């Protein structure tokens, strides 16, 4: 894991930067699947916007990034939305978001860590080494590609299990 410095409106951020591999997820965020007749983000985005997080301009799906051997834990997300009723197929869910950056082929893309809380998302097991990111469109990216992910250390704790 490396540290990179970025300037924000208030103070420099020392981003934690890790290498990861883009892998296939459940394939429900971006479009219809066996479990959902629609893309989940299509339903969720308007709710997130109404609650203060506008994802306009971001790709309508998630990048699933395998961070092994690292794991992550959200400790102070920028947004947490509780009891989001976006489907009648299961009970409301909680979601948290924290800013991040994805670097692919030396180009940096703004993004958000997208974290459906596992305690409210019982249908899908989420590996603690798998980071889901909603980013601006990244031309040419595909499964198996290596990326770097930068996360805010005050908001996301990254560790390497012993």
Predicted regions and their residues:
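Fold-independent oxyanion-binding glycine-rich loops
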Residues: 25, 116-117, 152
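Residue-level "contact hotspot" at macromolecular interaction interfaces
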Residues: 140-142
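Glycine-rich active-site loops that engage anionic ligands at enzyme catalytic sites
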Residues: 81-138
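Short, Lys/Arg- and Gly-enriched loop/turn segments at beta-strand edges
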Residues: 154-162
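Anionic-ligand-binding alpha/beta catalytic cores of soluble enzymes and soluble regulatory domains
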Residues: 5-90
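Loop/turn positions that initiate beta-strands
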Residues: 144-149
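Conserved "cap/hinge" positions at secondary-structure junctions
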Residues: 135, 151-153
């Amino acid at each position: 894991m490396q540290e990179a410095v970025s300037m924000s409106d208030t103070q420099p951020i020392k981003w934690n930067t890790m290498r990861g591999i883009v892998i296939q997820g459940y394939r429900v965020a971006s479009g219809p699947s066996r479990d959902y007749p629609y893309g989940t983000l299509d339903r969720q985005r308007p709710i997130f916007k109404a609650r203060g997080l506008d994802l306009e301009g971001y790709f309508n799906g998630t990048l699933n990034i395998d961070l092994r051997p690292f794991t992550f834990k959200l400790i102070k997300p920028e947004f947490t939305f509780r009891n989001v009723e976006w489907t009648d197929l299961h009970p409301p869910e909680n979601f948290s978001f924290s800013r991040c950056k994805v670097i692919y082929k030396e180009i940096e893309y703004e993004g958000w860590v997208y974290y459906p809380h596992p305690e409210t998302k019982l249908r899908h097991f989420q590996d603690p080494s798998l980071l889901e990111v909603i980013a601006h469109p990244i031309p040419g990216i595909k499964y198996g590609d290596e990326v770097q992910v930068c996360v805010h250390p005050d908001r996301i704790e990254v560790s390497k299990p012993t």
